[in-house]
Amino acid sequence: MNTHIKTFEQLTTKELFNIYKLRVDTFVVEQQCPYHEIDDIDLESHHIYLQQGKDILAYCRLYKQNDAYHIGRVIAATKRKGYGTQIMKTAIKFASNILHTQSINIEAQTYAKKFYEKLGFVTNSKPFDEDGIQHIKMKYTVK
């Protein structure tokens, strides 16, 4: 299993295709959220993913917006294998050690709140609707 952290420009067309396919399969098809999955944030993000052979096991993107770092589009292709935890820990470590941020923000789907709390994120908003799915804002403070 290999971990990759790449900017948009560093991704090959095949890597980008596999990332977009996983995201569309998860967010558009599985979660029935027919909204724009590909956006301009991709151009400014670090794309972080775990890969085994040709398969992407987990993915997230890390980006800076309004002077704050954010993690989004978190996916584990197979649930309950630890891939989601591994990709989040990689993103947090990269953000704190390489990008030198003191905090990281996420907008988590409410059902995943406990997953993010185990990683050290704290809820800092009431639930809100985004594209028909309940979310909460959460923040991680680097220790």
Please report, for each region that a protein language model flagged, where it lies by residue.
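Short amphipathic alpha-helix that is part of the acyltransferase structural core
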Residues: 1-40, 47, 52-56
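Conserved GNAT acetyl-CoA-binding A-motif
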Residues: 95-109
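Short beta-strand micro-motifs in enzyme catalytic cores
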Residues: 44-48, 69, 134-138
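A conserved beta-turn-beta hairpin within the catalytic core of GNAT-like acetyltransferases
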Residues: 64-72, 79, 100-102, 130-135
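Residue-level recognition of conserved beta-strand positions in structured domain cores
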Residues: 73-74, 140
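Conserved acetyl-CoA-binding loop-helix of GNAT-fold acetyltransferases
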Residues: 76, 81-93
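Conserved beta-strand in the GNAT
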Residues: 49, 55-63, 68-73
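Conserved catalytic-core motifs of GNAT/GCN5-like acyltransferases
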Residues: 117, 122-137
